[in-house]
């Protein structure tokens, strides 16, 4: 054991809790949306996409991590490590790029930079395809030799190799690519869209043709998406910051817990998105009941 066995027991229990909440809540989101026609709006396709990404994380990643934390090290070998890290990365990236698509959708609908634009089913499907392409562009390279997935922290879960400059893997270039293309750029787009959105909401009453109910509905959706973004940042920023610090200070000393805590905190992302969605979407709650 790298650390006190009790820490592994706590980790296992935490993962069990995440599976216990994460699976039903994401499955419910999927099921209710597919069951009720009126919920099948283009915007909800993206939220469905988030639920699918979370299920990937729960089934592909969390189950593996719970199993390995019972053993105190990563027992599933190279293949298991690759699979677990792939699903965790894919899920996290689909969530991030889905938030980008939602942010762009909010910006276009509320700020109307393109007049007479309607967010249709085709746009939603293009948005979905885009999130998957971008997520795969981040999760696949370590499987095919550009960087690699290795056990991290307490060695119960795997992630991208920020730790070493291993020969032949080009870790540095991948980590820099990942941070810029799959973290900074999406966040910049999200912040740009919400910056414009806040300005538009302030200027809105002066130039409004739409009914009050439409406005209220748009505001509610915007509020929900903003809270999802804040939730994403709360979950993923500590992990990204620690990973970047380790990458910049390779060879310096840090304990296994240092990387484990933010990494496992980030995993809670699979629960909060559907919770926000269920808590803030009246129509969804009615259909659920």
UniProtKB/Swiss-Prot annotation:
Cysteines joined through disulfide linkages: 81-158
Cellular component terms (Gene Ontology): membrane; photoreceptor disc membrane; plasma membrane
Record-level GO BP terms: absorption of visible light; G protein-coupled opsin signaling pathway; visual perception
Family stated for the protein in its record: Belongs to the G-protein coupled receptor 1 family. Opsin subfamily.
Localization annotation: Membrane; Cell projection, Cilium, Photoreceptor outer segment
Residues in compartment: Cytoplasmic: 33-44, 105-123, 196-223, 280-289
Main localization (coarse): membrane
InterPro entries on file: GPCR_opsins, GPCR_Rhodpsn, GPCR_Rhodpsn_7TM, Opsin, Retinal_BS, Rhodopsin
Protein name: Rhodopsin
Membrane spanning stretches: 8-32, 45-67, 82-104, 124-144, 174-195, 224-245, 258-279
Position of sequence motif 'Ionic lock' involved in activated form stabilization: 105-107
Source species: Abyssocottus korotneffi
Membrane topology qualifier: Multi-pass membrane protein
Role played: Photoreceptor required for image-forming vision at low light intensity. While most salt water fish species use retinal as chromophore, most freshwater fish use 3-dehydroretinal, or a mixture of retinal and 3-dehydroretinal. Light-induced isomerization of 11-cis to all-trans retinal triggers a conformational change that activates signaling via G-proteins. Subsequent receptor phosphorylation mediates displacement of the bound G-protein alpha subunit by arrestin and terminates signaling.
Glycosylated residues in this chain: 171
